[in-house]
């Protein structure tokens, strides 16, 4: 059961990963999104509904993504490092770039990888709508997930806009690294390059063990301003731990 919940957490992380980043200037960019996840009951255990704010800071060669108040991910291209920070446990994992899973994954995680297969498909539609101030195009994402003989299909409806002055290559650079943190998502980076623009609204549903989980994520704002001191640094007093993508918590 814990592995199934951990998998859903990974998928949620994946969904939250699509903070796309605007063009660079002297100041950094601060991006805010809101995410709602419906309540779900799996094997008699109920996960309550959750509302949380996600935020991303991005500079020229570094970024920080916060998922609520419990977890942060820092990418430092200047140091060739990624840090995964757990604020509840006060721990962090350090990963060298480029990522080599043969070196960093524990044996248990490698065994889990062998039991999983994840295949994404992105389809652009002709549907358009204006969301807030942004003209958007609808994309459909179908994800086929196989784990230990179980099929756990996932569907995403993504409304994407080119109205926000996005540097797509910069976006791909950072989100590619975030997706690569999860070895089962290794095929996602190329497939999601089919999307031309910035995800303004994402609706996600996933089937797992007879239950359906739904979430909604929407862009709130994009600002250009100086990041507070220490934004891209590790917090003091945290303990270093081994990285295991199947045990990441939100």
Where in the sequence are the language-model features?
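Extended soluble regions of mature proteins
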Residues: 25-250
């Amino acid at each position: 059961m814990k592995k199934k919940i951990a998998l859903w957490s990974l998928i949620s992380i994946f969904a939250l990963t699509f903070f796309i980043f605007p063009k660079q200037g002297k100041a950094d960019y601060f991006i805010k999104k809101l995410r709602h996840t419906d309540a779900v009951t799996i094997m008699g255990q109920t996960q309550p509904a959750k509302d949380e704010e996600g935020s991303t800071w991005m500079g020229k060669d570094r970024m920080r993504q916060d998922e609520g108040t419990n977890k942060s991910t820092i990418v430092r291209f200047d140091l060739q490092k990624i840090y995964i920070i757990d604020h509840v446990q006060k721990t962090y994992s350090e990963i060298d770039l480029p990522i080599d899973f043969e070196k960093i994954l524990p044996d248990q995680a490698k065994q889990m990888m062998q039991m999983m297969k994840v295949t994404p498909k992105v389809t652009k539609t002709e549907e358009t709508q204006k969301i807030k101030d942004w003209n958007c195009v609808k994309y459909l994402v179908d994800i086929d997930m196989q784990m230990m003989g179980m099929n756990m299909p996932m569907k995403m409806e993504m409304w994407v806009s080119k109205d926000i002055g996005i540097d797509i290559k910069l976006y791909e650079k950072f989100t590619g690294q975030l997706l690569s943190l999860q070895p089962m998502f290794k095929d996602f980076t190329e497939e999601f390059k089919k999307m031309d623009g910035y995800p303004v609204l994402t609706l996600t549903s996933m089937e797992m063990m007879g239950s359906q989980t739904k979430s909604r994520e929407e862009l709130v704002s994009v600002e250009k301003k100086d990041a507070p001191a220490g934004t891209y640094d590790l917090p003091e007093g945290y303990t270093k731990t081994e990285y295991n993508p199947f045990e990441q918590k939100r």
